Amino acid sequence: MARNTLSSRFRRVDIDEFDENKFVDEHEEAAAASGEPGPDPCEVDGLLRQGDMLRAFHAALRNSPINTKNQAVKERAQGIVLKVLTNFKSSEIEQAVQSLDRNGIDLLMKYIYKGFEKPTENSSAVLLQWHEKALAVGGLGSIIRVLTARKTV
């Protein structure tokens, strides 16, 4: 009995290894290794410089990080989409919204409402124009689907 209590095997465990401040989620590591979800900022910036707003709009909405829990990826995607939305001319907004299907309009509405949460200079006026056109095409159902959706952008 005395022999078991004097054992020092328990001292070989490095308790700093189990520090909760050093926690790393395996899913985030796998996502970072396989390429993060979200729009490609280089592709979107290139299309914006070329003046191809419609393709930049579709590229920004492609691969949206809805299923990820990484908030930094979601913020980066929100910034890219907001940059594209603010670069559109007022006369081109309706054509861009009409080029989307129902799921695309719902995704656009999610980004619009996310933009309303954290307004930047002049973004609210632009987002209101986008909201008006998206509401005309998607109807009230798109607002309800966005507000009741569990997966956010």
UniProtKB/Swiss-Prot annotation:
It comes from the Eukaryota. The modification Phosphoserine is found at S64. Its main location: cytoplasm. Disulfide bonds: none annotated. It is found in: Cytoplasm, Cytoskeleton. It holds the Pfam family P16-Arc. GO terms for biological process: Arp2/3 complex-mediated actin nucleation; cell migration; regulation of actin filament polymerization. Coiled coil: none annotated. Keywords: Actin-binding, Cytoplasm, Cytoskeleton, Phosphoprotein. GO terms for molecular function: actin filament binding. Gene3D superfamilies: Actin-related protein 2/3 complex subunit 5. GO terms for cellular component: Arp2/3 protein complex; cytoplasm; glutamatergic synapse; synapse. May function as component of the Arp2/3 complex which is involved in regulation of actin polymerization and together with an activating nucleation-promoting factor (NPF) mediates the formation of branched actin networks. Belongs to the ARPC5 family. May be a component of the Arp2/3 complex in which it may replace ARPC5. This is Actin-related protein 2/3 complex subunit 5-like protein. It comes from Rattus norvegicus (Rat). The gene is Arpc5l.
